[in-house]
Amino acid sequence: MITLTESAKSAVTRFISSTGKPIAGLRIRVEGGGCSGLKYSLKLEEAGAEDDQLVDCDGITLLIDSASAPLLDGVTMDFVESMEGSGFTFVNPNATNSCGCGKSFAC
């Protein structure tokens, strides 16, 4: 379904540890927005929803809702750090178009 690079796993683990709270997992969602129509949303959740698909990535639980699941199939998530900033990036084989900033896509 979705692959996290070592850099992404390390970043997610750091973020979970910094909350000081029990975290059920990282919610990855596709929602409307951005200049190409769809964008990724990430949020640490204390509990999952009934219809979530739970994906284990080396001990990190990903919470994926049923509407987002087909759009995330085959996605690779990375965490990059540069002089311009840091953040998560996504390579999505399902995307037919993406905007210049890399923050949104179309299927």
From Swiss-Prot:
SUPFAM superfamilies: HesB-like domain
InterPro entries assigned to the protein according to its UniProt record, in alphabetical order: FeS_biogenesis, FeS_cluster_insertion, FeS_cluster_insertion_CS, HesB-like_dom_sf
Superkingdom: Bacteria
Name this polypeptide is given: Uncharacterized protein in nifU 5'region
S-S bonds: none
One BP term from GO: iron-sulfur cluster assembly
Similarity comment: Belongs to the HesB/IscA family.
Name of one Pfam family that matches: Fe-S_biosyn
GO molecular function, one term: 2 iron, 2 sulfur cluster binding
